């Protein structure tokens, strides 16, 4: 493996990222990310791979509700109604990332990596993968109170799998 800025990531996660980037390059699919609880870790992981500039279009780190609204076009009313950690918000984040980029495929992550707030459980994470043709996949995971780092690494595996599924159609 080449030297990366994420030495704490397990080798299998880095290997999955390399495989995904090769698949995206082969299919000429450009990717955008919209991350909340992972704080840009997916974008960092993808851009650690040599040649990522050919397929990684951009990444949004929208940790706050305000950022989700300002950068991705979500409405505060939807966040208030559904909760920032919900299927609806994850799907809207993915759609907003596509709308605000030139990418073909978006992956959004929103969840509780550490202790949950008043409206959720530790380790609850929602993922959405949206394609330009309108196809969207959602995945809800209940990872439990594993701690921020462990939850974020688990999120990388799930996100890479969803991106692969999105590329393959």
Feature roles, as predicted:
Residues 1-169:
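Short alpha-helical segments enriched in small residues
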């Amino acid at each position: 493996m080449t030297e990366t800025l994420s030495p704490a990531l397990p080798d299998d996660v880095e290997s999955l990222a390399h495989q995904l980037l090769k698949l995206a390059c082969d299919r000429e699919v450009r990717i955008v990310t919209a991350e909340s609880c992972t704080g840009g870790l997916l974008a960092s992981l993808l851009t650690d791979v040599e040649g990522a500039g050919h397929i990684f279009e951009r990444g949004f780190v929208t940790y706050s509700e305000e950022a989700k609204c300002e950068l991705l076009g979500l409405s505060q009313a939807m966040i208030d109604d559904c909760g920032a950690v919900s299927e609806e918000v994850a799907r809207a984040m993915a759609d907003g990332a596509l709308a605000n980029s030139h990418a073909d495929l978006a992956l959004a992550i929103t969840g509780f990596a550490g202790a949950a707030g008043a409206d959720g459980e530790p380790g609850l994470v929602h993922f959405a993968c949206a394609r330009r043709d309108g196809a969207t996949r959602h995945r809800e995971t209940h990872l439990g109170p594993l701690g921020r780092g462990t939850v974020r690494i688990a999120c990388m595996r799930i996100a890479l799998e969803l991106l692969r599924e999105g590329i393959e159609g």
